[in-house]
Amino acid sequence: GHLGELECECFNAYRSDVKFTGVASHTNNARANGMVNAISMASSFVSNLPKNQSPETTDGREGFYCPLKISGSMEEALVSLFLRDFDKKQMEKRKETVQMLAETVANLFGGKVQVTHVQQYLNMKEELDKVPFVKEVLVKAFDECGVKPVMTPIRGGTDGSRLTELGIPTPNIFTGSHNYHSASEWVSLTQMVKATDIVITLSNLITKI
């Protein structure tokens, strides 16, 4: 990220897999045979996700639903999506929304649906708040290196969020990289060196605690 970024808060993250099951039939007599098209169900499900709660329509602390992939056939179709939110209670509501929407679509078409939620990572803020000295010593390392810390919540996850969950408090600092996950991703060598200086300074400070 940009010079000075210091992140102690990230999304709670889940992946949801929504599997629709239809009834295959020859198209010649589909009505008489009760065809239920799983692809149509999957398409309807995605189309009815809240349009003002997608990655491209949100920022800051707003969460979202992000469809990742639709695959399958008339008989079975799978929709995979990311659920993201900084607040745990709001995340539970998002999971409930996915379940309710999936069941509504399945009932409307006369098919079946199975929803599975998989936890990916959790907001590290809750655990980092229990050990304030971790952030304090990191801010001191920034100061000694002449870098003003810019506290921002990260709209994503980090290796640190998973380490924090495992009991190793690990805030995230800038690396000099920009435009992540795009064709124009690039890195500033100057900022990378400054990040390295901070890590070295942090290591020295920690040995004195």
Describe each region flagged by the PLM.
Residues L3-E5, K89, Y121-D129, G160, ...:
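Short, small-residue-enriched loops and turns at beta-alpha junctions
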Residues M100-L108:
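Redox- and metal-dependent alpha/beta enzyme cores, enriched for Fe-S-associated oxidoreductases
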Residues G1-E96, E103:
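Midchain, well-structured core segments that form catalytic/ion-binding scaffolds
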Residues S40-T57, F64-C66, K112-V113, L122-P171:
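Active-site-adjacent substrate-binding region
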Residues S16-V18, P171-G176:
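Non-cysteine beta-strand/loop elements that form the S-adenosyl-L-methionine
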